[in-house]
A protein has these predicted regions:
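Active-site-adjacent betaalpha module
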Residues: 2-13, 59-183
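Generic N-terminal amphipathic, Lys/Arg-enriched alpha-helix
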Residues: 10-26
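Conserved residues at the C-terminal ends of beta-strands
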Residues: 17, 55, 105
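Active-site loop/turn elements of alpha/beta-hydrolase fold enzymes
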Residues: 19, 56, 132
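A positional/architectural concept
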Residues: 22-27, 31-53, 58-59, 63-69, ...
Length: 183
């Protein structure tokens, strides 16, 4: 039976990938990516979903872009491989969190997002890539990356789609707070 993509917030981790200073000027639709990434970061706090933030070779590429409103409660992991799964620290954290779903957003769609999505699948995780919170230097690379991930079994979602899937129902305090975020 095919996977349905039903996600449980208690078994989910958000991973913000490589939204770093040196990448910012070259990335297509960067303002939308930053806006939606900030919504996801804030939602991770509201929904009590762990947030892992990665930085690709920060010594050369800078740290997480200052317009990303990172919470105090996050796990920051530096990496040199395109995939977080190349980091023992990342793998250890995923195992500690006991998650079965991973939500990916950040840059670049056709490099690090793609590699992480495929490696997460290989590690038996359900993978959700937030299409309106990823980008590349060209729209074509983003589009091809999304198609490639979809072919492999990744669930392609939007910011609002994943948040309301995680909420499950209206009328809660979480629902009210998330609704304010996406308006």
């Amino acid at each position: 039976m095919e996977k349905l993509g039903i996600i449980d917030k208690k078994k989910t981790v958000f991973v913000l990938i490589d939204i770093q200073d040196k990448f910012i000027p070259a990335i297509k639709d960067i303002d939308k990516l930053i806006s939606n990434s900030n919504i996801l970061v804030k939602a991770s706090e509201i929904l009590n979903i762990p947030l892992i933030v990665t930085e690709q070779y920060p010594k050369g590429l800078g740290h997480t872009y200052e317009k990303i409103d990172l919470p105090d409660k996050k796990y920051l992991i530096e990496k040199v491989s395109f995939s977080c799964f190349g980091s023992k620290e990342f793998i250890k954290k995923i195992k500690e969190l006991k998650v079965n779903s991973i939500v990916l957003f950040g840059i670049e769609a056709h490099v690090c997002i793609l590699k992480n999505a495929l490696d997460a699948l290989k590690n038996n995780l359900d993978v959700y890539v937030v299409a309106d919170a990823i980008s590349s230097r060209t729209a074509e690379n983003k589009s091809i990356a999304i198609e490639r991930m979809r072919q492999s079994g990744v669930f392609i979602v939007s910011t609002e789609m994943i948040l309301f899937q995680l909420l499950d129902k209206a009328g809660t305090e979480e629902f009210k707070l998330i609704s304010k975020l996406v308006k």
